[in-house]
């Protein structure tokens, strides 16, 4: 009787083993591999990455009519180490648009001190042509050469309505390049 029980246990063990071996056939696992191989672009010079630009201090009486502008301050962006294959880049200045003039950059309380000027926004200009660069709109190809480049722009205040009021006139502007 003892031999019969051992025999039955051995048969049961091999039966279970056979079931697991039969079920453990090859499994196929699907993996998706992705990434990019891109040409070397350019680097933004450290001194250009975080800039504090003082446009100036102006009397509010200079902004009593709509579309009045201040003198401009330079905004230079140094681009270094551009690869030989880079011929240019599309440029995008982005930020919060002014509600009355959406092509202009809205003043924002960057320091939390309040007392914001009203009826005034920041206008971005191409330094060479003096043409406005609309905020949040990609500008077509800006030529770049291999090596180092300086992109030259200007910023100025522009009144968006008659009767602007004085105060804090700070704003935050972002800059992006899409290489060609």
From Swiss-Prot:
GO biological process: one example: cell adhesion involved in single-species biofilm formation
Task: Kindly state which keywords UniProt assigns to this record, in alphabetical order.
Answer: Signal
Q: Does the keyword Nucleotidyltransferase apply?
A: no
- Entry keyword annotation includes Cell cycle: no
Pfam family example for this protein?
Fimbrial
Q: Which SUPFAM superfamilies does the record match to this protein?
A: Bacterial adhesins
Q: How is this protein induced? A: Expression is negatively regulated by H-NS and subjected to cAMP receptor protein (CRP)-mediated catabolite repression.
Q: Which residues constitute the signal peptide according to the record?
A: 1-24
Q: Which GO terms describe its cellular component?
A: pilus
Miscellaneous section: The operon is cryptic under classical laboratory conditions, but is functional when constitutively expressed.
Q: What does this protein do?
A: Part of the elfADCG-ycbUVF fimbrial operon, which promotes adhesion of bacteria to different abiotic surfaces.
What is this protein called in UniProt?
Uncharacterized fimbrial-like protein YcbU
């Amino acid at each position: 009787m003892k031999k019969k029980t051992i025999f039955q246990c051995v048969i049961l063990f091999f039966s279970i083993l056979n079931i697991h071996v039969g079920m453990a056939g090859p499994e196929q696992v699907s993996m998706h591999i992705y990434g990019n191989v891109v040409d070397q672009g350019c680097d933004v010079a450290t001194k250009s990455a975080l800039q504090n630009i003082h446009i100036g201090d102006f009397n509010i009486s200079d902004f009593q009519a709509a579309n009045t502008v201040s003198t401009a301050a330079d905004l230079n962006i140094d681009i270094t180490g551009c690869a030989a294959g880079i011929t240019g880049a599309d440029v995008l200045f982005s930020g919060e648009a002014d509600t009355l003039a959406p092509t202009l950059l809205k003043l924002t309380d960057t320091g939390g001190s309040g007392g914001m000027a009203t009826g005034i926004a920041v206008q971005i200009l191409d330094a060479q042509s003096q043409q406005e660069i609309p905020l949040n709109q990609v500008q077509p190809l800006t030529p770049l050469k291999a090596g180092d480049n300086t992109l030259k722009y200007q910023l100025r205040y522009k009144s968006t309505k008659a009767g602007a009021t004085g105060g804090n006139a700070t704003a935050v502007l972002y800059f992006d390049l899409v290489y060609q």
